């Protein structure tokens, strides 16, 4: 397995890991704090020496790798909701990377969160609110808004909305990295077996 394929699959798992948390929070109103922290941390690693630097908590990526296997593998039952979120994220990523203005604002806002972390934990409500604000102010303005399905009782809560937006920002960060590593949408059609095999090997490491 080539290093680039391994790293590209890792970044793709990062997208799906964040998407899985969005789905869970929308349905259940809560999240795994460690998984949430791992996804948010990936947003802050903007100049990594390797993809592994972005995803320091390898265990947190397990759900992402498992989703690669189930969504791109031979399983008959695909999660259409996960697919819809993924397609939306990849479409927004293209708009983001084509806008130097948006990328500049994104970098500036991420630096503000770095400074905030000298006073708060990454899963503190104020920090999550800032991650969510970045998504609302910059990413949401780029194109059609993602329609999140779930329990209306949870979705109307401000904290739930902020966690979802913060995680969508994390998914965007992984999508940008996936593209930088050579990821293309056609790979998800024509190279599915290779991606699935790589994900399965990654699950055993």
Curated annotation (Swiss-Prot):
The keyword Oxidoreductase does not apply. The keyword Cytoplasm applies. It is a peripheral membrane protein. GO terms for cellular component: cytoplasm; plasma membrane. Keywords: Cell inner membrane, Cell membrane, Cytoplasm, Membrane. It comes from the Bacteria. InterPro entries: HflD, HflD-like_sf. It is found in: Cytoplasm; Cell inner membrane. Belongs to the HflD family. This is High frequency lysogenization protein HflD homolog.
């Amino acid at each position: 397995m080539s290093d680039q394929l391994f790293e590209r699959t890792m970044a793709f798992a990062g997208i799906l890991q964040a998407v899985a948390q969005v789905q869970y929070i929308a349905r259940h109103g809560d999240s795994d704090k460690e998984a949430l922290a791992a996804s948010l941390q990936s947003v802050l690693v903007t100049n990594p020496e390797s993809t592994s630097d972005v995803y320091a908590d390898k265990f947190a990526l397990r759900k992402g790798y498992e989703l690669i296997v189930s969504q791109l593998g031979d399983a008959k039952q695909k999660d259409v909701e996960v697919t819809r979120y993924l397609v939306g994220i990849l479409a927004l990523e293209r708009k983001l990377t084509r806008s130097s203005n948006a990328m500049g604002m994104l970098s500036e806002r991420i630096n503000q969160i770095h400074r905030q972390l000298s006073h708060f934990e990454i899963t503190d409500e104020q920090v999550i609110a800032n991650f969510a604000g970045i998504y609302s102010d910059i990413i949401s303005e780029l194109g059609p808004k993602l329609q999140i399905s779930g329990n209306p009782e949870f979705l109307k809560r401000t904290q739930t909305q902020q966690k979802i937006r913060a995680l969508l920002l994390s998914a965007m960060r992984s999508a940008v990295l996936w593209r930088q590593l050579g990821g293309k949408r056609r790979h998800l059609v024509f190279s599915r077996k290779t991606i699935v095999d790589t994900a399965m090997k990654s699950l055993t490491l």
